[in-house]
Structure formats: C-alpha cells, structure tokens
Amino acid sequence: MGNLHTSIAVASICLTSAFLGCVFGLGFFVWIIYGYSIGGFFAFLSLFHLLEFYITARFQGSQLSWDSFILNNGKAYWLAMLVGLLECLLSGGKSFAKVINCLRFPSFLINFIFSVYQTSALGFLCLGQYLRSSAMVQAGQSFSHIVASKRNKDHLLVTDGIYAYVRHPSYVGFFIWALGTQMLLGNFVSTLLFSLVLWKFFSQRITTEEAYLVSFFGDSYEQYRKKVPSGIPLIP
C-alpha cells in the first residue's frame, strides 16, 4: 500500500485494526455466550491477522505496511476459508459428526469422539498461533512474509530457540492453525482438503526458499538442514 508514513496508509491501518478488533469481539461473544463455533472461527481468524501486523510492527518494523496484516493473502486463501464456512453452514457444524455417525458407533462413543475433535481444535488453534508468533518474534528482522531472493544486511541464520527444533516454525504454526479453524467449525471435508492443499503449498515454498537460504548461508544452512526437520510431515 505504499509508504507507511502517509495519511492514507495510517488511516487504512487504523480502520483495518478497528474492524478486526470488532470482528474479534463480536465473534468471541457469540462463541462464548451462545456456543456457536462460527463465532470462535471469526475470533481466531481476526486475531491471527491482528497479531501478524502487531508482531511485524514490533519486531520487523522496517518491513511494516498495511500488507503486514496479510489480508491480501491471495484469492485461494479466502476461497478456502469461504468453502470451510459453507461446509459448516450447510452441515449445521456437524460435518465431522455425520461422518462418524456413518461408522455406526454407539451414540456415547460418537459424542466422545466429536468432543475430542472440537477440543483438539482449540489445541491446534492455540499451538499453531503460538508457533507462528514465536517464530516471527525470534527471527526478528530476518523474518519476512515474502520469500527473500536477495540477502539483506539484517538477514541472519537463526538456529536457536524454536528454530532449534524445526526449521520452519512459522509454516508449521500456520499449517496447524489453519487445520484448527476447520476442526473448530466441525468440518470433515475442509479439514482434509486444507491438509492436502497446505502440504503441497508448503512443500513447494520450502523447496524454493531453501534454495535461496543455501545461496545465502552456504554450508552453515546445509548442516542445519541435516540436523533439524522442517516440522511438516513428509517434508524432510
């Protein structure tokens, strides 16, 4: 959106923050008071985008712009979220439960499995957000929402903290968080589709990004890659 230090850019950021804050508050209220999971979905979704901007402002200030909300995350991102919402609305939030019902389990077991599924959704959302935010904070100026094709002077190879356990904690975090959004909605089909599409996306992105990282850091990155997993299943 151009230079951050213009009245239009600042106004846009203020309005976007206010809008996301309202969505979070309303969604959280509907979720907690009325028990509608769709409210929780919007609360976690708006919080994610608010934190993307806040952490960028706090730890990657030189990169800050309206784009840091990553609301322009591509048509595929919003289409996927829309499909998830439609599945939830059409199934009454019981898509997963209906699939389990087809297995002819006893009703108490079906209720238990569905309860575990939705409880796991909260775990996925919180864990995913934690990993994503922690990765951005620990990487500092070395973090970027866009794959860097050229090394900047502030770009360092971060191998400690959360990066000592997985090479791409921000991707792992987003992967887990995105699955959590669909699990919270009680979706079955969208959860599977998200898993497949995100795996393919990150497989390609990691391959591209690591080619650049090897060119930036040479053998240091090669050795790091041998010792630490990517964090996403079936992606070495």
From Swiss-Prot:
- The catalytic activity of this protein is classed by the Enzyme Commission as 2.1.1.100
Q: What reaction does this enzyme carry out catalytically?
A: [protein]-C-terminal S-[(2E,6E)-farnesyl]-L-cysteine + S-adenosyl-L-methionine = [protein]-C-terminal S-[(2E,6E)-farnesyl]-L-cysteine methyl ester + S-adenosyl-L-homocysteine
Q: Name one GO biological process term.
A: response to pheromone
Q: Which InterPro entries match?
A: ICMT_MeTrfase, PPMT_MeTrfase
Location of the protein in the cell: Membrane
Q: What is its main location?
A: membrane
Binding residues annotated for S-adenosyl-L-methionine, in chain numbering? H155, L156, L157, V158, Y163, H168, P169, S170, Y171, E209
One term of GO molecular function: protein C-terminal S-isoprenylcysteine carboxyl O-methyltransferase activity
Query: What are the protein's UniProt keywords?
Result: Membrane, Methyltransferase, Pheromone response, S-adenosyl-L-methionine, Transferase, Transmembrane, Transmembrane helix
User: Where along this sequence does the record place binding of substrate?
Assistant: R205
Topology of this chain in the membrane:
Multi-pass membrane protein
Question: Could you tell me which Pfam families the record lists for this protein?
Answer: ICMT
Highest taxon above the source species? Eukaryota
Q: Name one GO cellular component term.
A: endoplasmic reticulum
Entry similarity comment: Belongs to the class VI-like SAM-binding methyltransferase superfamily. Isoprenylcysteine carboxyl methyltransferase family.
* Free-text function comment from the UniProt entry: Mediates C-terminal methylation of the isoprenylated C-terminal cysteine in M-factor.
User: Which protein is depicted?
Assistant: Protein-S-isoprenylcysteine O-methyltransferase
**What is the native source organism of this protein?**
Schizosaccharomyces pombe (strain 972 / ATCC 24843) (Fission yeast)
